[in-house]
Amino acid sequence: MTEEQAAQNRAKQELSVLYRISQHMAQQHDVSSLLNDVLDILALEIGIQRAAFALRRPDSDVFVVEAARGMSAEEQRRGQYGVGEGITGRVAQSGEPALVPDISQDPNFLNRTRSRQGDKTAFLCIPVVHQRIVIGTMSIDRPSAPLEVLQHDLHFLKLVGDILAEGV
């Protein structure tokens, strides 16, 4: 497969993901179900290892994992981050996405859920912003890859987050 064919396949795959997410948004009125559906789509279509949506608790600066893949219920319960705390909290604070090519080498990565085992994994985290307020974050783990591939994934996740902000 040529590089051009690979890029075309990736574009088709991403378009399919966006279409499926939009269909679920049109049908789903429960936020938790919608977030779980989106994670299912991402797991099926792009093969994420681990992923989590953390939403801001009402009237607080704490973000709590609302939906996750690749984590046990206990690991998910441990996923609570204050604004500015760790990478997820910094994304919530700044409203800017974060890309960590290798979490084992980043001292800011808290591994609060304790769901990672020290393998060479990239961590991508994007803010979910509605009316200029960060209402949540979406993070994924994926095998480490060249920086340009990770940056492309981060941009795609940002697009997914922007679309979801309207449904959350």
What are these regions (language model features)?
Residues 1-33, 44, 135, 167:
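Signal-transmission linkers at sensory-effector interfaces
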Residues 40-43, 50-79, 104-105:
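GAF sensory/regulatory domain recognition
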Residues 71, 137-148:
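Short beta-strand-to-loop transition segments that serve as allosteric relay/switch motifs
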Residues 73-74, 101-122:
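Signal-transducing coupling segments at domain and membrane junctions
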Residues 74-98:
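Acidic/proline- and glycine-rich, intrinsically disordered low-complexity segments
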Residues 121-129:
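A short, aliphatic-rich beta-strand micro-motif
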Residues 128-131, 145:
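Sensor-regulatory modules in signal-transduction proteins
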Residues 154, 158-165:
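Allosteric cytosolic regulatory segments
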